[in-house]
Regions:
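Glycine/proline-rich, flexible active-site/cofactor-binding loop segments
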Residues: 1-9
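Histidine-acidic metal/acid-base catalytic patches
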Residues: 13-177
Length: 177
C-alpha cells in the first residue's frame, strides 16, 4: 500500500495528512512491511513541511517508495506547479536527498514521478509543457547536485559556518560556482 499524504483537499481534513501520520497509521496495519509512502512535494508544502525533510525521514525508515515532484506557493489549495518554479532551493534539496540516498537504484518500488495538472485554458499543443518543464528542471538540478562540493560542505560544517555554505549553494544554483 502506497500512501500519498495530503493535509487538506478535497474535504479539508485528513487522517494521514503528513508522512509521520501516514507511517503511524501504517504501523498499526496487519502487515506494516507492506505500507510505504509516496511523498508529493506540494502536499508536504501544504502541510507546512519541507518535502526534502519528509523524503529524508521516509528514506531513513526505508518507507519512501515513490515521489511526485512538483511545486507549491504556500499553504493554499494544491496548485501542482511545475517542479522548482516557485522555490528552486527547495527543489534542489529534494533532488539532493534523493541522489545522496540512491533513490531508484534498489530494485523495488522506488520511482520518481512528475505530478500532472490539467490546464483547461491552455492550447492542446501545450498540454504536456508542465511535464516537459518539470523534467528539464529536475535534470538541471541533478547536474548541480552531481557537481556539489561535499568537501567544502564538510569544511563549512566543521567550522560551523553555515552562512558560507548557504551562499555556496545559492551561487551553485545561480551558475556562479
Amino acid at each position: 500500500i502506497l500512501v500519498e499524504p495530503k493535509p487538506n483537499e478535497p474535504i479539508d481534513r485528513s487522517i494521514c495528512g503528513t508522512a509521520g501520520h501516514a507511517l503511524a497509521v501504517g504501523a498499526y496495519t496487519v502487515d506494516p512491511s507492506r505500507v510505504g509512502l509516496c511523498i508529493e512535494s506540494a502536499h508536504s508544502i501544504l502541510a507546512g513541511l519541507d518535502p526534502a525533510n519528509d523524503m529524508g525521514f521516509a528514506l531513513a525508515l526505508n518507507k519512501l517508495w515513490g515521489v511526485h515532484l512538483n511545486d507549491q506557493n504556500g499553504c493554499r489549495y494544491d496548485q501542482d506547479k511545475a517542479f522548482g518554479v516557485d522555490n528552486l532551493r527547495n527543489a534542489f534539496n529534494q533532488v539532493k536527498v534523493l541522489y545522496e540516498n540512491n533513490f531508484g537504484d534498489r530494485g523495488n518500488f522506488e520511482c520518481v514521478g512528475l505530478d500532472v495538472k490539467a490546464m483547461r485554458t491552455q492550447p492542446d499543443e501545450d498540454c504536456y509543457r508542465h511535464l516537459i518543464n518539470s523534467k528539464r528542471i529536475f535534470e538541471l538540478l541533478l547536474d548541480k547536485v552531481k557537481h556539489f562540493d561535499y568537501e567544502f560542505q564538510a569544511a563549512c560544517v566543521k567550522e560551523q559556518n553555515f552562512e558560507k555554505l548557504e551562499m555556496y549553494v545559492m551561487e551553485l544554483l545561480m551558475g556562479i560556482k
